[in-house]
Amino acid sequence: MWLFFGITGLLTAALSGHPSPAPPDQLNTSSAESELWEPGERLPVRLTNGSSSCSGTVEVRLEASWEPACGALWDSRAAEAVCRALGCGGAEAASQLAPPTPELPPPPAAGNTSVAANATLAGAPALLCSGAEWRLCEVVEHACRSDGRRARVTCAENRALRLVDGGGACAGRVEMLEHGEWGSVCDDTWDLEDAHVVCRQLGCGWAVQALPGLHFTPGRGPIHRDQVNCSGAEAYLWDCPGLPGQHYCGHKEDAGAVCSEHQSWRLTGGADRCEGQVEVHFRGVWNTVCDSEWYPSEAKVLCQSLGCGTAVERPKGLPHSLSGRMYYSCNGEELTLSNCSWRFNNSNLCSQSLAARVLCSASRSLHNLSTPEVPASVQTVTIESSVTVKIENKESRELMLLIPSIVLGILLLGSLIFIAFILLRIKGKYALPVMVNHQHLPTTIPAGSNSYQPVPITIPKEVFMLPIQVQAPPPEDSDSGSDSDYEHYDFSAQPPVALTTFYNSQRHRVTDEEVQQSRFQMPPLEEGLEELHASHIPTANPGHCITDPPSLGPQYHPRSNSESSTSSGEDYCNSPKSKLPPWNPQVFSSERSSFLEQPPNLELAGTQPAFSAGPPADDSSSTSSGEWYQNFQPPPQPPSEEQFGCPGSPSPQPDSTDNDDYDDISAA
């Protein structure tokens, strides 16, 4: 059993790799040659807290930790061996010793580093080399007992990286130190992955922006890299694939970067940029500053870094309104607040705090209040005039473009309205009369005053009624037809004289308004039409005392309303057998209406020709002996047989007057 436990312990010790404890009187040394180093493996030595992996404090790995090498036993052979092992060329002629360790350890360098907490470096390891190669070196534990300095070296092929002209160590133009000279990087194929490598190498977090050339001030000196193409996993920028700087890439194409740990400040809510609430841009967002430790030293550093002089007043702030909160603690000698001790989103340090505010000496409002010798009104006008003029110039330029646009729009609208109005006027002048004359003609004629019932008279469209003329048939033989002693008279030699008739009386007067509404000329022979209708009443034959049968075309001869019948050779026969039919106004009205609705194609009885246009009705003076006359009387009474008789021989009749030969028509 005891044998089993012993074998198990030996196997455990062998697998763990711990060396067997050395005697108390002998130092525990481990040769570098005992640990085989092959390419690709990580060396047990490194340089930290420098500008690159080729300069800084020498650290060696002991078991699972990194320990700084003792500076008391540091020599040139060890420095040369370390620089060659790290691929940084040879060491510089004079090796430098590290200063005494400060009370507070420096911030950790890039990579997985750990710093010993020993303040006196008691028992620190030492690197002892017998030649300028790494295989001739060995690490001795607890070699230094009282020396408090650390070994430090700068190799000849030192490479460094920095960001300049960006307002801090974590933003600006990218520059590399190569062959002892600082140079820039060309922005060809420069992207966010390349900027990530830069920010991580400098300990500034991650990249927020990868900026092209001319965003920052152009650099000077050579251009060390062109077409850099990093994957984002490289530890150093010079480990990324790329090309050496060419001559065709100038400083106008210098690449830049802004890292998440970069801090920039501003003052808001004041009269100008030198007064207001303190805000810091950190990790891509704006944050407020806690006033729990906002003292004159912190305010002084901020005002100086902003170029606003010194701090004059620290007014009480408002509650925090932004997402993040930053805490600063300065001694007053720092260049920027980022060089002070700071904490971000620490609830303990910023509890029950408000947003910090500051008033710097370069503020315009403070300058106006602190110069009583200059009138405030004059100072205000002088300072604000420059700003006001810029605003007015901008607004005036906008107004100069706006006002002509409005005027042109109004003119265009007015011209369109005017053109539309002119077109409507032209259309109404030439098109409306045609529409009225051809499409909206009146269809009825108002009845006369003697009509007791409305008599609609339909007139065909576009057919104007002409005076109806009945051409009297020429007598075959005026001398042989009757014993007329009338002389032949040419009626066309002397125009007839218009006399006052029933048609032109007051009862048939058509006013001007009715004429304008009707828009057509009324036919002048309305009374003639009435007489023509009335001619349906049969008359007696003077020779044989036989009533003539009524014909479809009643015998009607146009005569003047003022004609005077003085013929003495005509035979008149009033036969008692030809009694007048009883008066029927309705029948007469219907016959009149139907007659007027018919087109004026009238025919005389017998072999009379159709109506034709001839002289006016007023020109007919019926003096021929061969004409038949019919005298109409309003409503007639049935006469007795004694009043009718056939005369034996014709005898000259006395001259009849107008009142005897013509009766007024009173029937409607």
Swiss-Prot record:
The chain crosses the membrane at residues 403-423. Glycans are attached at residues 28, 49, 112, 118, 229, 339, 345, 368. GO terms for cellular component: cell surface; extracellular region; immunological synapse; plasma membrane. Residues 45-156, 161-260, 265-361 form the SRCR domain. Residues 18-37, 471-490, 537-668 are annotated as: Disordered. It comes from the Eukaryota. Changing residue 346 to A: Strongly reduces interaction with ALCAM. After T-cell activation, becomes hyperphosphorylated on Ser and Thr residues and phosphorylated on Tyr residues. Glycosylated. It is a single-pass type I membrane protein. Changing residue 352 to A: Reduces interaction with ALCAM. Detected on thymocytes. Detected on peripheral blood T-cells. Detected on natural killer (NK) cells. Soluble CD6 is detected in blood serum (at protein level). Detected in spleen, thymus, appendix, lymph node and peripheral blood leukocytes. Expressed by thymocytes, mature T-cells, a subset of B-cells known as B-1 cells, and by some cells in the brain. PANTHER family: SCAVENGER RECEPTOR DOMAIN-CONTAINING, T-CELL DIFFERENTIATION ANTIGEN CD6. This is T-cell differentiation antigen CD6. The gene is CD6.
